[in-house]
């Protein structure tokens, strides 16, 4: 059923081929300008001039993940702020006596007044 030598061979290849120190030692990724900014913003380097020409793929993955998380947190904060602004705006409109149903009734009233008197008009919907 099981081929022990194939199983052991695959486990050895998997453990030796992707060891963490070996993957970190291989610096084969050349960062572009945006990735250099990411490396600086994440605190890995002090300035873009200090960023080396090649960095490891693992380092770049970690930096991208940090930036993805930061961007998601910023979007969450902006969404919460936007919701708060909309709630405040709605409460102010309610104090002024504005409502969606009143705006809808006014629009229908204006629409019906502007409708031509001829028979070509669309039939009014009944509720």
Swiss-Prot record:
Keyword match Transmembrane helix: yes
Transmembrane segments: 69-88
One family name in Pfam for this protein: DUF1075
Membrane topology (UniProt): Single-pass membrane protein
Keyword Membrane among UniProt keywords: yes
Keyword annotations: Membrane, Transmembrane, Transmembrane helix
InterPro entries: DUF1075 (IPR009432)
Location of the protein in the cell: Membrane
GO CC terms: membrane
Main location: membrane
UniProt similarity note: Belongs to the UPF0389 family.
Protein name: UPF0389 protein GA21628
